[in-house]
Curated annotation (Swiss-Prot):
Record-annotated TCTP domain positions: 1-168
Stated family: Belongs to the TCTP family.
Cited function: Involved in calcium binding and microtubule stabilization.
Native organism: Cucurbita maxima
PROSITE patterns to which the protein is assigned, alphabetical: TCTP_2 (PS01003), TCTP_3 (PS51797)
Top-level taxonomic group: Eukaryota
InterPro entries for the chain: Mss4-like_sf, Mss4/transl-control_tumour, TCTP, Translation_control_tumour_CS, Translational_control_tumour_p
Keywords of the record: Calcium, Cytoplasm
Subcellular location: Cytoplasm
Name of the encoding gene: TCTP
GO cellular component: cytoplasm
Pfam families: TCTP (PF00838)
Gene Ontology molecular function terms on file: calcium ion binding
Protein name per Swiss-Prot or TrEMBL: Translationally-controlled tumor protein homolog
């Protein structure tokens, strides 16, 4: 199994269990999330409740909770929304922090294509929810989530150069 960590913080953000599609010259990975129900478990032990007292279920008080699989699996933490000015400031800081961590061709491709990726993300800002890894470090790579028109499940966008592949 492959896990993708935030190159800046080491937080796990994604794994190969979630297929991705490359966008913007490979700068952005698009991943489909899914709402899943977690929690309540209905266990049938074969007992006959009508023969056991007043018929009320005295089982465990489980509460079912709906979560997004990617957010839950990688313990992503939601962040406040950003306006255009905040986003540009974040991208400038991100470029400054990430560029020295990339080597050779990866660094050149990053410098060449980050502007296109930024222009791709900018018009969608108002629709995004923002997430970072579990550590919630100030230098974390942001994961962007939004709903396509008519979709019931969120789509996640990752800045691919900030992901480090680790074999588990």
């Amino acid at each position: 199994m492959l896990v993708y960590q935030d190159l800046l913080t080491g937080d796990e953000l994604l794994s190969d269990s979630f297929p991705y599609k490359e966008l913007e010259n490979g700068m952005i990975w698009e991943v489909e999330g899914k709402w899943v129900v977690q929690g309540a478990v209905d266990v049938d032990i074969g007992a006959n409740p009508s023969a056991e007292g007043d018929g009320e279920d005295e089982g465990v008080d489980d509460q079912a909770v709906k979560v997004v699989d990617i957010v839950d699996t990688f313990r992503l933490q939601e962040q406040p929304t950003m306006d255009k000015k905040q986003f540009i400031a974040y991208i400038k800081k991100f470029i400054k922090l990430l560029t020295p961590k990339l080597e050779g061709e990866k660094q050149e491709a990053f410098k060449k294509n980050i502007e296109g990726a930024t222009k791709f993300l900018l018009p969608k800002l108002k629709d995004f929810r923002f997430f970072v890894g579990e550590s919630m470090h100030d230098d974390s790579c942001i994961v962007f989530a939004y709903y396509r028109e008519g979709a019931t499940d969120p789509t996640f966008l990752y800045l691919a150069p900030a992901l480090k592949e680790v074999k588990c």
